[in-house]
Amino acid sequence: MLPSVLPVHAGTRLTATLVNPVFIADLHLSPFKRRTARAFFDFMKTTAPLYRELFILGDLFEFWLGDDAAWIAGPVTKALAAYSASGRKLYLMQGNRDELLGADYAAATGAVLLAPQTPVVTAAGTRILLSHGDEWCTLDPDYQAFRTMMRDPAWRTMAPEKTF
């Protein structure tokens, strides 16, 4: 039997006992989706502050070519950093569009980068399985091979040398 609260990110013994969480996913922010971007900034200004913890469960961005490209998402980075600087907790999970989102971006926003393995957290006595969802595409072996490659630490160190 699993414990009721499990670690949510690699490398620490921290567990997530949630007080007042909100979960968002699949925003696919890009310069070409201005209405979605406006809705995100409105959410960050008016709604997110009502919650103690914000979980972004993947695909915050339409695409992410690496943490060295963080300048592309400057206003988003600032909004997330302001949220975490206010004393709230920000958690970030990679999706299938932003799987190269990494520790540098998490540090820039004050976020905890969630482990690639699907974590379980507890809120109000209820266990919640956190997942972007792409790992459940088990009938697509080509995608699963691509996903495994993109999340392989050895491959990621060579990623800037790769041609997409």
Model-derived features with residue positions:
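Histidine-centered catalytic micro-motifs
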Residues: I24-L29, L130-W136
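Active-site-proximal loop/helix segment associated with metal-binding centers of metalloenzymes
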Residues: S131-F164
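Hydrophobic, well-structured mid-protein blocks that either form specific transmembrane helices
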Residues: L114-V120, A124-E135, P141
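Core catalytic region of metal-dependent phosphoesterases/phosphodiesterases
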Residues: V8-H9, L14-I24, L29-A123
